[in-house]
Design a protein with these regions (language model features):
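Non-heme di-metal
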Residues: 1-139
Length: 139
């Protein structure tokens, strides 16, 4: 993909992710016993994904129009975490591809910050999945 296509794809994905994390934060705060921590984490992720949209807009010279698609919130925490694990890993790959395709060092630095946040999201999601699986084994 060329840089414009990568930016558009990432813009669409980040827009979807920001919305999805926000909806799931609300859902899991109500649905889960002691879901406050997951809700706070997902709310933070939603805000960070929204900040990635601003970075993409700065690189593109203006925010592309997002092609919104409705992604249903996870029916369970495990389902949501597995979906986010895949989405975050794909975002990291796409951001690395975009960075490699750009020449402007300032844009590469901006993307490094985004990639670092995406990696942090992925690590957190994997920790939650590991803890969830361990709690199921103990039950």
């Amino acid at each position: 993909m060329d840089p414009e296509q990568l930016i558009q794809r990432l813009f669409n994905e980040e827009s979807d992710d920001a919305s999805l994390y926000a909806r799931e934060a609300e859902l899991f705060s109500r649905k889960m016993v002691d879901g406050r921590r997951v809700s706070e984490t997902f709310s933070r992720f939603a805000a960070e994904e929204a900040s990635h949209l601003r970075v993409l807009g700065a690189i593109a010279g203006g925010e592309p129009a997002a092609r919104r698609r409705e992604i249903g919130a996870g029916s369970s925490l495990e389902f949501a975490l597995k979906a986010h694990e895949q989405r975050e890993a794909e975002s990291i790959r796409l951001y690395n591809d975009l960075s490699a395709s750009l020449e402007d060092p300032a844009h590469k630095i901006m993307l490094k910050g985004v990639i670092d946040q995406e990696r942090s999201h992925l690590e957190t999601i994997r920790r939650y999945l590991k803890a969830l699986r361990a709690s199921k084994r103990e039950a």
